[in-house]
């Protein structure tokens, strides 16, 4: 299932991301804000557990997410603000990291680092800013599936139809929650209109 959350607020935030004047600090902040909206939508029907807490009225029980049953995984480095946003909302969630680099000539992706916690029987939330060709995301999903995750949810800020179709073809069971689906990929496999290089813009490494 692919769900696009192209609401007026999200469209306004995405427009700010597209602006070339938006600096790294502001860019990361907007990415985190959009991620919180995506997370809320992705988990709106998630099961809850009872939690007994001390309040100003004494001991009381409330329904909450079982944070230990979730893992958030980011594809370095553009996805780091998204991971931070998820962990700010769910501070007891476990986190994992994948480093996948795209060959600019072949446009194929290559994994060069992975650090994942125990995923068996858990819901894994994969976060990445852009879904272009879908190669990196398919690789990430393949890796997480070997860890016997119960369910995988993908959160993306923007994506191209070609990449979404590629992921759906390889992983038809995948749930993707995305804030904006852009027009297409150009001849260099960049998303149009896109955001530019999200990692460079987040961390001020644009040459």
Residue ranges, per PLM feature:
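PRPP-associated nucleotide enzymes
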Residues: 1-207
